[in-house]
Amino acid sequence: MTENIHKHRILILDFGSQYTQLVARRVRELGVYCELWAWDVTEAQIRDFNPSGIILSGGPESTTEENSPRALQYVFEAGVPVFGVCYGMQTMAMQLGGHVEGSNEREFGYAQVEVLTDSALVRGIEDSLTADGKPLLDVWMSHGDKVTAIPSDFVTVASTESCPFAIMANEEKRFYGVQFHPEVTHTRQGMRMLERFVRDICQCEALWTPAKIIDDAVARIREQVGDDKVILGLSGGVDSSVTAMLLHRAIGKNLTCVFVDNGLLRLNEAEQVMDMFGDHFGLNIVHVPAEERFLSALAGENDPEAKRKIIGRVFVEVFDEEALKLEDVKWLAQGTIYPDVIESAASATGKAHVIKSHHNVGGLPKEMKMGLVEPLKELFKDEVRKIGLELGLPYDMLYRHPFPGPGLGVRVLGEVKKEYCDLLRRADAIFIEELRKADLYDKVSQAFTVFLPVRSVGVMGDGRKYDWVVSLRAVETIDFMTAHWAHLPYDFLGRVSNRIINEVNGISRVVYDISGKPPATIEWE
């Protein structure tokens, strides 16, 4: 019997902050399971979840507005510790008898908080000291409204010059509120505060570790599918690869992986996937060469969205055909991860994340009545990678840069042709190889090459050439919501350009994309 790694858990109620998923990831990093729900939960749902503690997230709304989100009153009656962050502190203060007002000045950025009163939340935690020996904390503020009066049974723990109630606490009820964001790295002691709340105040054990997650997932897969056969679409990406390894550990040869080679992959990627998962790890893989079929379907199409839909449709068709060839397959496995689940969650109030339908594979034929196996659906991407390492997958594969689902189909601008894909594959491989050699690959968040459907005059030896143009793209970002173009060294860019033009016959010019996001997107299409 495996250990119950969900025994101690934190419930995070989401009021819409851009940092809310980061709060959840920080709690998981502390070895404690947590779930992220929309703020408008019911008492029955909270009782059923049985949390060891509750965190109220930040949010963009104003608590001074009549219809702004509020925590369910039961949150404060459940008898568990509650931690309000930014908006979460404001709604806690207002709902428990305090007062919140709009501020003429929005406080955004670095601030120093002076600790005035002892509290379990910050005891022994400091960045520096005042002249008279009081602890100071370096924190990150992001708020417009502020608490102007705390509930009568709370005490002021810390303040700033412009924020008199930066931390408030009711130690008896174990209610805490902070006006800053402990989850961001700019709040230097933020992880220690979260650890203090989760591990000490809520008394959660660190049960959520990669090894225990694997044991739990394997046990649950075996319980769910028994001796039945399972099919998985393996792309070679992180999510499907880790899903494949978990299933292989759980059910061995009862797993069949279908690898659809669509002709839109990186250089030698198909061979690498087959070598790694088939030859090295011994998985049962069906390799489906489908380049011609995909390129035929894409012929003549220039619109990026139409290309995405064509690639998705043809993939589903090919996968379905292969699935129908297999006998007695009763389960479809997908690499759905926790952010997909969060995005798919609908809220009656419309305050939750944008709702979208999530399908890794798409629809299966109606005649195939299959159950769904999603062993990663509780995990964030960083957790999936850690589990992949624990399962023996190579670091370079798990931590390589993001690659779009439609592959080179959206990195070849305009119509997709085999000639263009072949040129792009080789140029991109040179760029990535040089980034690794220069120890720059892990210093940028994403790097790739784009094929431009324009010809440019060049000179090669004594002759002129009229060949294609590619653009190099490299960005630095924390969350991929915004990004800066990477300031790569000129000599490095020159070396990459020379290699591509000299080694890839058919390319005469290399340019570098210096657009940020916004206004540009990271991918060109």
Curated annotation (Swiss-Prot):
Residue stretches making up the GMPS ATP-PPase domain: 208-400
This protein's name: GMP synthase [glutamine-hydrolyzing]
The species this protein was found in: Salmonella typhimurium (strain LT2 / SGSC1412 / ATCC 700720)
Keyword Kinase in record: no
Entry function: Catalyzes the synthesis of GMP from XMP.
HAMAP family the UniProt entry points to: GMP_synthase
Gene: guaA
GO biological process, one term: GMP biosynthetic process
Catalytic activity: XMP + L-glutamine + ATP + H2O = GMP + L-glutamate + AMP + diphosphate + 2 H(+)
Pathway of action: Purine metabolism; GMP biosynthesis; GMP from XMP (L-Gln route): step 1/1
UniProt KW keywords: ATP-binding, Glutamine amidotransferase, GMP biosynthesis, Ligase, Nucleotide-binding, Purine biosynthesis
Keyword Nucleotide-binding among record annotations: yes
